UniProtKB/Swiss-Prot annotation:
CDD domains per the UniProt record, alphabetical: ExoVII_LU_OBF (cd04489)
Listed InterPro entries: Exonuc_VII_L, Exonuc_VII_lsu_C, OB-fold_nuc-bd_dom
A GO cellular-component term linked to this record: exodeoxyribonuclease VII complex
Protein family according to the UniProt entry: Belongs to the XseA family.
Molecular functions (GO terms): exodeoxyribonuclease VII activity; nucleic acid binding
HAMAP family: Exonuc_7_L
Protein's name according to its UniProt entry: Exodeoxyribonuclease 7 large subunit
One Gene Ontology term from the biological process aspect of the record: DNA catabolic process
Enzyme class (EC, first level): hydrolase
Its biological purpose: Bidirectionally degrades single-stranded DNA into large acid-insoluble oligonucleotides, which are then degraded further into small acid-soluble oligonucleotides.
Length: 413
């Protein structure tokens, strides 16, 4: 084991590096590891067999080395895509710098266990809100381009393409073929989903597979795929086509279709149905317009038959006669009022004249005023004491005034 620190001046040789790695790996001890089998390489005359164990969610794998008799003695043969749990010890071969897992036991993951894990994951994702209808995106009415993820040359691909093009011949497809079962299915589907989701020309994505066994459909319940679908900006349709067992993808996708054919029908409208609908709407619109025109014509005819429009001058003449009568009555009332008021004024004038000083003077009476010598206004004489002899007097009669002087005064008895 090297004691010096690795530096540019004192680098470690490859053998020392490999020995260090080997020592560290050997300290890990025995491990239980779960994954999916792939690339099973078994020869009857070999003592050792070589397999690849892949992660169920990511593109990660590890090489397995195990005695051939372990595989030969199994009650059912192993095949690619089997979910298994292996027991082994990590081993690093320093001579060629390779890592593998030395396996001494291989156990299949039971269907019951797998279904229990799926249901547990289903509950977890539901609690996180991934199944919430509020987060599901609406599909476009008429997609210009449909993304399709499915197996190469599969019946699902043929069904979707043929049904969709029969319904709407102008629809375009961007098809990405992936594995739809086995260890590589999930990473390939996620990669295809990401590519289609990033394409601005793709309006909706269909993930399709034409059914299969529970084991075959396991990739469509893997957590990584569910989170990728939930994060996609483009609407995703699940078309797995397996009614008894519902993959989690059916819950997370924006729309679940029973089969690939059903997906094509629900994603792409039928041109014949749309043409029929357009004709029906056009006929309904024309009927509604004709009905409206008929009602308006009837209303106009009703208005035209009214007397005021049949003889428009008669109401005017009638109103003019009413105005003339009103003017005549008003003139008569005004004249009557004027005569009444004139008579009242004449009567009041006569009363004023009869009661005024002029009428009294006309009957021979007079008003005697003494004219003070200091120029002050004349004073009406009411007593002889106001007119001592020599006082200048002003005597007012009916038709004028007389100036006189007081000669003497005589007190009445």
């Amino acid at each position: 084991m090297p004691s010096a620190k690795s530096t540019p001046d004192t680098p470690w040789p490859v053998r020392d590096v490999n020995n260090q790695v080997k020592n560290w790996i050997e300290r890990l001890g025995h491990l239980w590891v779960e994954g999916q089998l792939a690339q099973i390489n078994v020869k009857p005359n070999w003592k050792l067999s070589y397999l690849t164990l892949r992660d169920v969610e990511q593109e990660v794998s590890v090489q397995l080395t195990c005695p051939t008799e372990i595989i030969r003695n199994r009650p059912t043969p192993l095949k690619d895509g089997d979910r298994v749990i292996v027991y082994g010890k990590p081993a690093f071969y320093a001579g060629r710098g390779s890592f593998s897992l030395w396996v001494t036991d291989i156990r299949p993951v039971g269907i019951g266990q797998l279904l229990a894990r799926i249901e547990e994951l289903r509950r977890q994702l539901a609690a996180e809100g991934l199944f919430d209808p509020a987060r599901k995106k609406r599909l476009p009415f008429l997609p210009k381009c449909v993304g399709l993820i499915t197996g190469r040359g599969s019946a699902a691909e043929r069904d979707v393409l043929s049904v969709a093009r029969d319904r709407w011949p102008e629809v375009q497809f961007k098809v990405i073929n992936t594995a739809v079962q086995g260890a590589s299915a999930v990473p390939e589907i996620i990669a295809a989903l990401g590519e289609l989701d990033q394409d601005p020309g793709v309006d909706v994505i269909i993930i399709a597979r034409g059914g299969g066994s529970v084991e075959d459909l396991l990739p469509f319940s893997e957590e990584a795929l569910q989170r990728a679908v939930a994060a996609a900006q483009t609407p995703v349709v699940s078309a797995i086509g397996h009614e008894p067992d519902t993959p989690i993808l059916d819950n997370v996708a924006d729309l679940r279709a029973a089969t690939p054919t059903d997906a094509a029908k629900r994603v792409v409208p039928d041109v014949n149905e749309e043409r029929l609908l357009i004709r029906q709407l056009r006929d309904r619109g024309a009927a509604a317009l004709r009905g409206w025109v008929a009602r308006e014509q009837q209303a106009l005819a009703s208005i035209r038959t009214r007397p005021v429009l049949a003889d428009p001058m008669t109401p005017i003449v009638r109103r003019r006669e009413e105005v003339e009568r009103a003017v005549s009555l008003l003139r008569r009332d005004v004249n009557h009022m004027l005569r009444t008021e004139q008579s009242l004024v004449a009567s009041l004038r006569a009363q004023v004249s009869a009661l005024g000083p002029s009428a009294t003077l006309a009957r021979g009476y007079s008003v005697v005023q003494v004219v003070p010598r200091d120029g002050t206004p004349p004073q009406v004489v009411t007593t002889i004491e106001q007119t001592p002899p020599g006082s200048q007097l002003r005597i007012r009669v009916a038709d004028g005034a007389i100036t006189a002087a007081a000669m003497n005064t005589q007190k009445s008895d």
